């Protein structure tokens, strides 16, 4: 593993010494705070997300879950009570309120495709249940019994009926086409909205018929933000485009493309979009990794290679494609490993500043500055585009310029920008309140040309008046 201190050398972020007078846009940047308890989410909103301009935060499923130790128990509901090892209903409500007060919307991870996979048990908050019997919520007739495979589990992803009516990994599959099930799901989601939630990530949306989700979402208040988890699979019948009418989509193809940085290659987003690998930008949630891809080996991660992961995140924030989602979580050595917990099994506070097993991307200075750069330039046209296998560069109107070097060797060359002539400074060396540049200054000529020495695996972002 590369030393995380290399990030300060690898990511060179620059800004004009003169102030920026451009009209500011509202940030579109979000973050997944995976397994942060409610108190920690509120703290991060107040101390880092709000001040940095992060627009929304995705939090882990808030409902009561199976009472076991692994992280994935949160994705096995046993009731719709807002009570989990991440915190109580009152703590959840307080968290949402505190985040909203500093301009951060809360998106809740909604597990509505299924309930648990356990034969029976008692949930975290004391609710007794059986696999197909959840008192006051669901009975056996509220679940699919597909009869299409052994044990009613999905074995053929090319078969739409199996994907959407059989059991995912043995989890009891709700009959989301029935009126009773839809009403109870809507009641749960409306309960969360009453606590201030702005929208939902629909977990395992691929396993719910698009028409079922249309009916559920239509019953929610207008303006509820929706993002679907639908992984594209070659040769599969169910495809992400079916879900575009009801919300945005997590674009897993973007995450896979970001692994190009691992082989010293800058992803060509324009080419990938033209070849049909991506959904339209306005509907895409772009990300480098999430809680699943972090564990299945299909993405860059903050633990496996922090320098490359951070470089890809900077690239994501600089690009025009999608609505970017950052990622923060905890370190682990085993797939099933839960976050740090207390004596009663409750998830402990995430103390980012102490580096006690938590990866807190939202507190990195380069990420904070890149959010600001994106917010100021996001509505400007992209010009002066250059792309080779190892580097890319582009301008954003007459205000911004970005260049990135994915190679493990230095790149020295001139770039054409649309920036005004001026002196620019390495903002990674700033703590936020310096009046002068503490590092090397960069000159942009009268013709807009800048000579840059891009360090190995580094990025440069310039901002003008």
Per-range role (PLM):
Residues 28, 65-97, 133-175:
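Aromatic- and acidic-residue-enriched carbohydrate-binding clefts of CAZyme catalytic domains
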Residues 23-40, 168-173, 177-178:
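Boundary/entry segment of secreted carbohydrate-active catalytic domains
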Residues 26-31, 44-50, 54-55, 61-77, ...:
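Active-site-proximal helices and loops of the catalytic beta/alpha 8
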Residues 166-179, 209-217, 221:
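Active-site cleft segment of glycoside hydrolase catalytic domains centered on the general acid/base Glu
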Residues 1-10:
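Bacterial N-terminal signal peptides that target proteins for export
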Residues 176-188:
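Alpha-helical scaffold elements lining the catalytic groove of polysaccharide deacetylases
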């Amino acid at each position: 593993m590369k030393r995380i201190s290399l990030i300060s050398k690898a990511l060179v972020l620059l800004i004009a010494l003169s102030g920026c007078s451009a009209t500011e846009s509202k940030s579109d940047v979000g973050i997944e705070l995976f397994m942060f308890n409610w108190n920690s989410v509120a703290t991060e909103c107040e101390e880092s997300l709000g001040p940095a301009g992060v627009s929304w935060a995705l939090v882990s499923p808030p409902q009561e879950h199976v009472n076991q130790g692994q992280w994935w128990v949160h994705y096995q509901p046993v009731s719709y009570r807002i009570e989990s090892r991440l915190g109580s209903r009152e703590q959840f409500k307080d968290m949402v309120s505190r985040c909203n007060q500093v301009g951060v919307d809360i998106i809740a991870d909604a597990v509505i495709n299924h309930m648990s996979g356990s034969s029976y048990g008692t949930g975290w908050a004391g609710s007794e249940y059986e696999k197909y019997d959840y008192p006051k919520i669901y009975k056996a007739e509220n679940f699919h019994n597909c009869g299409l495979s052994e044990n009613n589990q999905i074995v053929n992803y090319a078969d739409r009926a199996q994907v959407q009516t059989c059991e995912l990994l043995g989890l009891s599959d709700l009959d989301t086409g029935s009126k009773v099930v839809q009403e109870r799901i809507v009641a749960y989601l409306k309960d969360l909205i009453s606590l201030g939630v702005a929208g939902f990530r629909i977990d395992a949306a691929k396993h719910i018929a698009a028409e079922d989700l249309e009916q559920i979402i239509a019953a929610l208040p207008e303006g509820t933000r929706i993002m679907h988890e639908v992984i594209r699979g070659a040769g599969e019948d169910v495809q992400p485009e079916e879900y575009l009418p009801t919300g945005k989509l997590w674009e897993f193809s973007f995450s896979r493309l970001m692994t190009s940085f691992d082989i010293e290659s800058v992803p060509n987003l324009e080419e990938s979009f033209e070849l049909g690998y991506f959904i339209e930008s306005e509907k895409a949630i772009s990300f480098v990794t999430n809680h699943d891809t972090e564990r299945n080996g299909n993405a860059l991660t903050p633990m496996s290679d922090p320098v490359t992961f951070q470089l890809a995140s900077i690239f994501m924030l600089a690009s025009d494609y999608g609505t970017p989602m950052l990622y923060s979580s905890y370190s682990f050595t085993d797939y099933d490993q839960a976050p740090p917990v207390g004596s009663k099994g409750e998830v402990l506070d995430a103390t980012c500043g102490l580096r006690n097993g938590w990866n807190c991307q939202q507190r990195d200075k380069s990420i904070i500055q890149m959010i600001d750069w994106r917010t100021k330039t996001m509505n400007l046209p992209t010009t002066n585009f250059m792309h080779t296998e190892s580097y890319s560069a582009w301008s954003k109107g007459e205000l911004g310029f970005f260049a990135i070097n994915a190679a493990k060797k230095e790149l020295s060359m001139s770039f054409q920008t649309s920036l005004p002539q001026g002196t620019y400074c390495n903002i990674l060396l700033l703590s936020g309140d310096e009046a002068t540049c503490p590092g090397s200054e960069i000159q942009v000529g009268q013709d807009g040309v800048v000579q840059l020495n891009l360090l190995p695996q580094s990025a440069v972002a310039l901002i003008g008046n």
